[in-house]
Amino acid sequence: MRKLLIIMGIVSLTSCVITFPGTRYKHLTEDQKKRVVLCKAPIDSLTNDGKVYLVTIEQMQKFLNSKNRVLIYEYASFCQSEHCVNPAVIENECTKAGVQFCIVSVSYEGVFNISVQNTPILAIEPTIFGKKIGKDCSKVFFDKLTGTTWKTRGYGRYYSYIKGKFKGCYDDYSYALTGN
């Protein structure tokens, strides 16, 4: 009986690890997998063309340096927080405020259902850290992109940049737009 309980415990722990939100790439259809591509052009030349572009920190930094104001949304389709807002709403608010909007998805889950008009869908190029594009990869990606750690900048999904310089990380996109 004890061996059975140990085996059941191991199986349940393994199941949790397997189902923990990661890339979810293996759950994409073959057509969707073909639409996940390495970004080979400047980010500001991309359009919302149904593809997910895998980007590096260097590509993102070059993009940020070329813009006056940028709001990056660290998008997670599985997020249930009141602060996880439909990207189309944020895109509209950014357009009104004259702020460049950028989506960086931390998972492929639901990424092809994002409805935005003009914003290309970006994801972290998973091989840059030798890890999958899960929680740890996004944390390291944004640590390097902001020049801070999540402990010092606080946890938020919205990153504000002015002329390539990180200004803050916010829970609420409206604060990221106003800088308050």
Language-model segments: residues:
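Short acidic, S/G/P-rich loop/turn micro-motifs used as interaction or catalytic elements
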Residues: 76-82, 108-110, 129, 166
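Conserved segment of the thioredoxin-like fold in thiol-based oxidoreductases
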Residues: 94, 100-138
